[in-house]
Structures are given as structure tokens and as C-alpha cells.
Amino acid sequence: LSVMMVLGMCSVVGAEETSGSYGDNDGIITIQKAKKNQTYTIYRILKLESFSRGDKREEGNYAYTLEEGWDDFLTNSSEYPTGNYLQKDKDTGYVTWDSTKTDYAAFAKDALKYVKAKSIAPAKKAVTASEDGEVSFKDLPLGYYLIDSTAGALCSLDTTDKEVIIQEKNGVPSVDKVVKSGDDYKDNNTASIGDKVEFKTTITAQPGAQNYVLHDKMDAGLTFDDTSIKINLMKSGETTESPVGNTNYTVKIIDLESTNPCTFHIEFKQDFCDTLKANDQIIITYSATLNEKAEIGNTGNKNETKLTYGDNNKTETATTTTRTFEIPVFKYTLKDNKETALKDATFTLSKDSVTTPNTKEIIKLEKKNGTTTEEYLVNSSGTVTEITTGATGKFKIQGLDAGTYYLTETKQPDGYNKLTTPVTIIISDTGTITVKGTNVNPVKVENKSGSILPSTGGMGTTLFYIFGVILVIGSGVVLITKKRMK
């Protein structure tokens, strides 16, 4: 809740009239630039029993008496230090303002605190603005009024005319949220499981800020690092940030398994909020780790932020999305021109194209239970570095950042030729998989078998034997013929 004015009060007395009394129920207070869906409530502190004056209202005589229920406000200085700004005459009961007191904003806040503590009834029914524009309180008895707004914005009053106009000078706060993507901040990014994800939330404040509480909710795929929170303040018109001391706020970590929908809250102390000017920016940075519960694909992993302020008001929710992807692989061979699953092929996945096992960085994995497909999750502490295909020839590697990957066959099935070079796979920021310039899903890897070579003792050798025998026999016939001729 916030008091609707810098001075916090307004007197409704006659502007043109030179005299009047409390029974004149024709006072009007109009709030200009009222904010849509904000509620305005008016309380009367003093009755103006009568007045008389000349041309200048400040030179007139005014007889104020205390409204019922406000006596403790003037006397309980420990709870309401500015209550003694009003001086009540013991004999007559009339009230005057101590002219040496000028902290009107503090007085208004104490008066509002008293209203809540004592459940003081409003002077008129509260009004909620249906649109940005004006709201009015009409038919008001003459008196000294306090106006309260749920918007958390202060307005100034510098008139005691019978028809009083209040300017709603300030808007409501706003929240912007981004996530680090490379060297920039955007509303979305991509990451591998195990990567740190850095967030930045900016609250653009307004004067009269009250009850600022930042609420942050992370999906189950993000593990919040509660030591990572840093809060800075950048004053309006400036370009440098300064740290906000941790005495100015409290952080509450919420158990995600509970029914509370938030991951953490940051509640800003009112003393800090009181220092904020229009368009000052509170900049909060923090991080989380993408974990094994991460949603795979374009649905992504959400981080939502909103600010509650004033009396149960809240900003629009600001959201970022962190996506992580998968590479589905199908190992096959062609039999009768049909793709046939091939088992016992072994692969590694890396972020570099080096083929020497001792030098390239293999992505570590952990096995995940699948249905018809073997599934593996990225895990920097995982013990799986090679995947061997089963009877389906299929497997998936999940939890991958966008980027370029190299799938290397380290062992081929018996009787098949091993791939001589890695398969280059590119994952886009939207999860599209490209191989050799073509979008694919899954990544298909074919193995071929070579034709069989002739073996020793086969038909070819037999032919040599036959020809050899024929030659030997032929030689024998020649020798016999020659002997007979002799």
C-alpha cells in the first residue's frame, strides 16, 4: 500500500467561499492519471467544523477537530513518531499543525500505518480504476484527508480548495528478464546438461515503492545456485551500477517439492524502497545448472520472474527459455535395398574432429532407461564414452547444446567395413539436425560389407593342376613318339 501524495494529506475546504462548515457535503477529490486496476481509498483524519477567511485562504481561520478513532495517533509517539505534528488543545479539542514540522511524507506513512493497525473505516467506498484516467471521491464533508493507493505511487497535493485535483505522478514498476547466450543476453539460449545458465532480472522502480518482493520460479531441469545472487542498483540516467548491500534485502529459498510455486523470493526492505526514484533499476543476476531432469527439445526449460508490490499487485511474468537437444542415430545396412538395423557397431561423440583417441575430447555420458531406443544423457562425471548398438540399431544422445559434433565409429560389426571419417553433425539453435547440408532425423549411418576374395585351394588352383597334368602327359606322348620313329 502507498500513500497517494507527497504531503500525504489534503484539506477539502471552500475555494471561493469565505466561510463554511463540516455540514457542507460538497467536497470533491479527483485523482488524475489513475492507473488501471488500482484501488484508491480515502480516510478522514480531521473534520473542518468551520472556517472564515478573506481573499487569501492561508490567512483565514480554520477550526479542525479530530475524527473519531484517531486520538492514539497523536499520543503514541513510539509507534507513530510524527503523530505529534498535530497538536490537540486539551480544553477545546481543536487541532492545529505544528508549523515547525515539515516531513509530510513521514507523517502520511505513519498515518497509513495507523489506519491499518486500528482498522480505520474509509470515509467513502474505495474506487478501482477501470481504465487509466481519473477517479473521483464526491460529496465529501470538509476536512483533512489521507488517500491510499494499491499502485505504490505517490501523488502531490498543494491545494486546499473545495475541489481538489491529485496528480498520479508515477507509474507501476516493471520487470524484464534475460538469459546469457554467448556474449549477449536474450530471452532464450541453448545449453548442455551440466552447463551453468546465467540469468539477469531488471526491476524498473517507481517512487513510492512499497512491499517489493521478487518471485522466481525455475523448471525442474534447472538447479538454482543460491550463492550466485548479486544485486546492483543503477540510478536513472546513469550507466554504472553500484552494489546493493545485503542488509537491504532478504533471500528466501523455497523447497521445490513443497506446494509453493517459487524457487526463491527476494524481499526488499522498505527503507531501501523509500530511496528509489523514477526509473531507477534494480539489477539481479544469478545462475543455475541444467540438470538431468531437463526437458529435451524446443519446449525448453523455463525460468519465470514477477514482482509483487503494494497491496497484492503484481507485474506481468517475464520468462526465459533454455533449450537442450538430442542426436538420434540409426545404424543400418542395406539388404535387398531395405534398411536393416545393424548391431555391434561402437561409436563415440566429440566436439572436435580429431580422430586420434588419445587427443580428442570425448563427451561423457550416462545410460538412461529407454523403451525401444537406447538413451544416453550428457554427464561430465559419466562413465560411458562409447555406445554399442543393439538389435534395433538405434540410440539417442540427449542434453546437447547447439553446435557441431563428430560421431566416430570406433568398431564396426564383424564382416563390415568401418567408417574412415567421423560423421559431422550440426545442431541449430532450434534443434534442427544437419548432416552434409541436409536436415535429417534421425542421423542414419550405413555400414557396407566387402565382396569375398578367392581362397587357396579353390577353383583357380584346380585349373592350374589340370593344365599341369595335361602338359606332363603331353610331354610323355612326345617322348614315346620320338623313340618309335628312331
Predicted regions and their residues:
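Solvent-exposed loop/turn and edge beta-strand elements of beta-rich ligand-binding domains
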Residues: L1-K486
